[in-house]
Amino acid sequence: MSLTIPVIREPGFDHAPWFNGIIHGASAEARRRGVVCRVRECAADELPGLRFDDIESHIRPVILVGSSVEWLSNVKSLCADVSLRPILAGNCMDEGLFFPISTVSVNRSHAIMRLTGELYDSGRRNFALVGSLPDSFTDIHRRELFASVLKSFGLYREDAFYDQTDGLAECLTRFGKDVEKYDTVFFTNDIIALCFAPRAAAMGIAIPRDLVPVGFGNLPLSAAMLPQLISFSLDFVQIGRTSLKTALELSRHPEQLSCKIELACGICRGSDVCISAAGFDAEEMAYDDREYGALCYIDRLFSAGDRLSLDILRGLNEELTYSEIAERLFLSDSALRYRIRNIFSGLGAVSRADARRLTGRYLTLGIHNLC
């Protein structure tokens, strides 16, 4: 009988690139090794009562994927069952020293220190961090790490942190009012950076000359968008794969209660692409949650390697007719229209014009070469 490894996921992160990448990696590694990977959602208040009596194994590894402070605080309740081997994927926990909880995380500190040093040497002195969620353990840890690095360079300032206390739109609006005070901004993910950069250009801010945007790691997406960001290359799929491998190792060695694994974090350097405010009018300067959701969907296409959908999206933005797109991609009309319906649904678009409005100002013409 195949070993069954549960993956317990926190609700509410369906569109988060890091979240989907970890689960995709764990599922792919499970298929490769002939293991059953069973994903289920579990809210924070359900964790203490979670049972795995249906798994017929003396040692039962469990992969946990979540981010909120409340959810992670309740993870330690699973340690009451001595047969369980909880593995926290994508986050580290100081409490892991006191509870048998394994962690598979990314060591960002060295990469942040190195990049900040390079930007400092190039004359950058005014840094901001934008987009942190106040109830996210990951963002709290990242905020503390970023503050520590800035203090080491003598650049720390209390007002340089723009959190999503009142939502992303309000967060970006507040930063937009202060943007001229900064020459470098670290965004908590690349998608927020991509949403803000063209609006900064519309305000007359030259990117990257006046403002260097840095994102926290959706590498394939960043290389295909305008601007091509400096980004921390966090391989979320690899975190998922490593978590599954860790689960198998713990099941084979019952004497080992937990372990801590840190993956390396690299720096992806985008080219100095000058972007313009073309296509923006006064009404479109407002931040649109649909736009953020559309970029998350494109990120999922990249993560899944869905080259066909990306090529269709490229054709739509090139203003090709449906017949021309079908001919280019060797698709029947019915197959193309089926794909387009799925793309519109994923983007949250109601029409072709709406899809272009949501994505056209970001996608470069070379995205088909990146899959």
Can you annotate each of these PLM segments?
Residues M1-G117, F175-E180:
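Alpha-helical recognition/docking segments in bacterial nutrient-uptake
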Residues E29-A44, L129, A147-A169:
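Short beta-strand elements in bilobed, periplasmic/extracellular small-molecule ligand-binding domains
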Residues R33, P100-I101, G176-F187, I191-A278:
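Flexible loop/turn connectors
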Residues M93, S102-V130, G167-T173, A193, ...:
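Hydrophobic alpha-helical segments within soluble ligand-binding/sensing domains
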Residues M113-F153, C259-I275:
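An alpha-beta-alpha
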Residues K245-A304, S323, L365-C371:
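Linker/hinge segments immediately adjacent to helix-turn-helix/homeobox DNA-binding domains
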Residues Y292-A335, R361-T364:
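Helix-turn-helix DNA-binding segment
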Residues R341-C371:
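Basic, Lys/Arg-enriched C-terminal extension of HTH/homeodomain DNA-binding domains
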